[in-house]
């Protein structure tokens, strides 16, 4: 699940591009000949923001027409996230699903670029937070930058849990107790709207 199509290191791997999916879901919502929508999802997840965009489009479509998610071999992380906007979610007994979590990777190439390759950097900025994109390349990440990014990840994780709890018709506290990766036969059944 990505925001925009990019070349994959895995070759011709298919990508779920949020802008394309959102456009298609909006078209289905307006199509008078479509009475219900079945989304077949088979993905290990991806970008949290892209998953939120698709979740929103699924939720909006579900207000107009019933949306059913049919999970394939895997519907984990972002794929599970976007499924929670549907009226019904069905998984095969062997579907790997769940994996409710968000992470952010902070690469640090500063030693490679500055010490090994000899790059030199000067930093000119308008305020102390305007150089985030320079962190990890020109210099290591500061603790303050890591703390800000951790807060961003925590907010995304809280939103993810809320989307799942709302979609599963349960409170977040109960959901927290059951957070783990499961197969389709282990996952609690969804209740309909």
Per-range role (PLM):
Residues 70-76, 129, 178-182:
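Glycine-rich beta-to-alpha transition loops that act as phosphate-gripper elements at the mouths
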Residues 167-193:
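Amphipathic alpha-helical substructures
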Residues 1-65, 74-80, 84-167:
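Small-residue-centered hinge/linker elements
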């Amino acid at each position: 699940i990505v925001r925009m199509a990019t070349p994959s290191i895995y070759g011709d791997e298919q990508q779920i591009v949020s802008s394309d999916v959102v456009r298609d879901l909006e078209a289905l919502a307006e199509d008078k000949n479509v009475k219900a929508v079945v989304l077949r999802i088979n993905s290990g997840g991806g970008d949290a923001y892209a998953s939120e965009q698709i979740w929103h489009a699924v939720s909006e479509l579900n207000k107009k027409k019933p949306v059913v998610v049919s999970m394939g071999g895997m519907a984990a992380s972002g794929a599970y996230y976007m499924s929670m906007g549907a009226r019904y979610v069905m998984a095969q007994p062997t579907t790997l699903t769940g994996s409710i979590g968000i992470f952010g990777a902070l690469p640090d190439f500063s030693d490679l670029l500055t010490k090994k390759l000899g790059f030199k950097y000067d930093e000119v900025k308008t305020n102390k937070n305007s150089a985030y994109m320079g962190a990890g390349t020109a210099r290591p990440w500061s603790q303050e930058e890591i703390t800000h990014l951790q807060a961003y990840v925590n907010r995304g994780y809280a939103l993810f849990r809320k989307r799942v709890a709302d979609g599963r018709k349960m409170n977040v506290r109960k959901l927290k107790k059951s957070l783990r990766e499961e197969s389709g036969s282990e996952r609690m059944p969804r209740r309909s709207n």
